[in-house]
Amino acid sequence: EKIIAEIFKAEDCILTRGSGTGALRYGILSSVLPNEKILVHKAPIYPTTELNIKSMNLKVIEYDFNDLSTLNDTLEDKEIKFCLLQHTRQKPDDSYDLSEVISKIKEIRDDVVILVDDNYATMKVSKIGCELGAELSAFSTFKLLGPVGVGCLVGKKELISKVKKFNYSGGAQVQGYEAMEVLKGLTYAPVSLAIQAIQNEKLVEELSKKEKYPYIKDVFLANAQSKVLLVEFNENIAEEIIEKAEKLGALPNPVGAESKFEIPPLFYKVSGTFLKSDPTLKYRMIRINPNRSGADTVIRILESAYKSIQSKG
């Protein structure tokens, strides 16, 4: 934990049970009491995070962080003492810069405690939330080639100390071989993710060739939770593509998002938060995560799946 705190230039760190969800829960518990107000981005909240919020009966105050011009008005409410930010986008048109949002909040109200959900962002961005001025960052080490079910909360010592008191029981703590597995994962995860990013760039370049792939309307990279390839089709064939791709060797569901168990590419529906913003995307868009596969493998599966649909039609 001391090593991880040093990696992220933080005062302290604790490994938690319950992966990223557990880390977020403890981050909230360190600073918020039941029935208090919590400031969040005006967008669909990640389902497991929403469960944490509902279980404490927190009063959710929404603000669109894509436009900071009226943030001062919202923060005039002195009952708002805590803000939860998500590093990756929650809806397709999100454009806010996390660093700017944190700086603006602190400029207006330095007393507001900020917890950043860095799931899907850690080791993919130059700085996580606690390095940008937030009190806490929470993420899953399972998504970084670490052990199953282990999360990480890193940031201010005062708040981390509270969480350590919550976990005074030895059975609740992460230690021994599990803690070592976290460190092992963190040493290679950046390399693995960098290789994956190169494959994603190759896929965008190749699949953007309209004359070669006329059935594809648009293709782009997005931090739709993980940094993935979003492929929009001209026809409503997304669900069929996913079904065919599974038979051709693709994963139909994530197992922790880029965990050590995921080797084939993932052909999957767009995230629930994206679907809440536009339900029709379910029928014409998919997300593809290469995982440990190369661009050629992804294209082969996509092309074969589409041809299979065409031959059936």
Model-identified regions with their sequence ranges:
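Conserved PLP-enzyme active-site core in the AAT-like
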Residues: 6-193, 197-218, 241-243, 289, ...
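Short, flexible turn/loop "capping" segments at secondary-structure junctions
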Residues: 143-145, 221-223, 279-280
